[in-house]
Amino acid sequence: MADYDLTQKLIPHLDRHLAIPLLNHLSDIAIYPAEQLARAQYDLAKGTNMVNYVEQFHAQIENAEPTDFARLRDEATAKYQELQEKAQPVTKVIEDPDAVAKLRSGGDKDRNLDLLRSEYQIDIDQINALYHFGQYQYSLGDYGSAGNLLYHFLILSPSYELNISAQWGKLASNILNGEWDAALMQVRDLRETIDNPHGTSLAKPLAQLQARTWLLHWSLFVFFNLGENQGCQGLLDMFLSPAYLNTIQTSCPHLLRYLVAAAIISRRAPKPANVRSRDHVKELTRIVETEEYQYTDPITSFLKDVFADFDLTQAQQRLSVAESVVRSDFFLSGFADEFVENARWLISEVICRLHRRIDIGQLSKTLNLSNEEGEKWIVNLIRDSRMGVEAKIDLKENMLHITRPHATPTATLIETTRGLAFRSQAIQFAMQSSVGEPRERGERGERGNKGGRGRPRTQEVAA
């Protein structure tokens, strides 16, 4: 499945530490030569201060340049002690319960800064030392300590630019520490910061596009670890919003794989009672058709086969390849069974809408099921009230009879209005973007091939 591996497209938009798990996954599934992967892992890790981890891969590389790892350890230890000493005045304060209570009751950062100056003789430089110490902890791979230090820095610091950097660092720390609820909150905070830049460096359209591209990639870790309900639904809501859908189409069309996969995986997931159901599959079919010239793979092509071309024979063959792609994908591998199950459900829905009489044996064959499995599948299919059809099984003829109720004018009007509302939002966003900075002809396609320019700096926590 190396032909469909997205790792090389994803890594330029990730911090080095976030990219390490992707390469470890490739090592586990062995779709690339071991020597090549060891070299890639070494090149990635040597930009960090995780000396023992770097040494591990250095030993696996033939004819590697000699490296004095003992000296690197001594330098890392000395740097750690230096930064720890500079940050110590602030760390003492945040470890003091009485001081923390006073800071929490302060109400805002200006009052807290006055309190720190007057009672603890702490200035801005010492607060910034907390950021640099947290950043260094991150580079050492101590993500728990890094996240804690950056959390307190965000509470105390008045520096908008450093706060943005700390937000990225805290998100990465939460991800690598497996704190998914905290990471989701950080994704929302960063999204708010990026979408409302307030005259900062993010106010420039290109910087905002780059930041949104990073956030889309980093958020994959969060959404696909929150499950098919909260995670996939959250991904769909964010990725299909006009600003972020425009970003995907402009700079990272390969993320369409995860959009389509999330829509299929969560197709039958229970929705909260207060959330209106939205047919993402129909929207995505239009998007996949539009962006086919930029990106296509077996997962996106499967959706097009079913809902655009109605080529169910091709869809059946494509599903087999798509399943292999899903099982080898870092983010999707845990949802392989749900993907296949719901993909079969989509094929069944289309068949039931196209035909009034369906041969159960033929349907089972189309779904790659035995006759017995096919009969059980069809029983479950009939029970699903969201199919929008009534069905009965004729056991004598081994046929499924479909009755379709006609849609009411009101339902048709509502569905049409929803589509118009979504397209209007997309047009409005496109017009606003055009007013902000006109695009040159061909810019969209060029950016799509230059994702590597969005790579975070290697020695910094923040992107």
Swiss-Prot record:
<feature type="compositionally biased region" description="Basic and acidic residues">
    <location>
        <begin position="437"/>
        <end position="449"/>
    </location>
</feature>
<dbReference type="Pfam" id="PF09440">
    <property type="entry name" value="eIF3_N"/>
</dbReference>
<dbReference type="GO" id="GO:0006413">
    <property type="term" value="P:translational initiation"/>
</dbReference>
<dbReference type="GO" id="GO:0005852">
    <property type="term" value="C:eukaryotic translation initiation factor 3 complex"/>
</dbReference>
<keyword id="KW-0648">Protein biosynthesis</keyword>
<dbReference type="GO" id="GO:0071540">
    <property type="term" value="C:eukaryotic translation initiation factor 3 complex, eIF3e"/>
</dbReference>
<dbReference type="GO" id="GO:0033290">
    <property type="term" value="C:eukaryotic 48S preinitiation complex"/>
</dbReference>
<protein>
    <recommendedName>
        <fullName>Eukaryotic translation initiation factor 3 subunit E</fullName>
    </recommendedName>
</protein>
<keyword id="KW-0963">Cytoplasm</keyword>
<dbReference type="GO" id="GO:0005634">
    <property type="term" value="C:nucleus"/>
</dbReference>
<keyword id="KW-0396">Initiation factor</keyword>
<dbReference type="GO" id="GO:0016282">
    <property type="term" value="C:eukaryotic 43S preinitiation complex"/>
</dbReference>
<dbReference type="InterPro" id="IPR000717">
    <property type="entry name" value="PCI_dom"/>
</dbReference>
<dbReference type="GO" id="GO:0003743">
    <property type="term" value="F:translation initiation factor activity"/>
</dbReference>
<feature type="domain" description="PCI">
    <location>
        <begin position="224"/>
        <end position="407"/>
    </location>
</feature>
<dbReference type="InterPro" id="IPR016650">
    <property type="entry name" value="eIF3e"/>
</dbReference>
<dbReference type="Pfam" id="PF01399">
    <property type="entry name" value="PCI"/>
</dbReference>
<feature type="region of interest" description="Disordered">
    <location>
        <begin position="432"/>
        <end position="463"/>
    </location>
</feature>
<comment type="function">
    <text>Component of the eukaryotic translation initiation factor 3 (eIF-3) complex, which is involved in protein synthesis of a specialized repertoire of mRNAs and, together with other initiation factors, stimulates binding of mRNA and methionyl-tRNAi to the 40S ribosome. The eIF-3 complex specifically targets and initiates translation of a subset of mRNAs involved in cell proliferation.</text>
</comment>
<dbReference type="InterPro" id="IPR036390">
    <property type="entry name" value="WH_DNA-bd_sf"/>
</dbReference>
<dbReference type="InterPro" id="IPR019010">
    <property type="entry name" value="eIF3e_N"/>
</dbReference>
<dbReference type="GO" id="GO:0001732">
    <property type="term" value="P:formation of cytoplasmic translation initiation complex"/>
</dbReference>
<comment type="similarity">
    <text>Belongs to the eIF-3 subunit E family.</text>
</comment>
<comment type="subunit">
    <text>Component of the eukaryotic translation initiation factor 3 (eIF-3) complex.</text>
</comment>
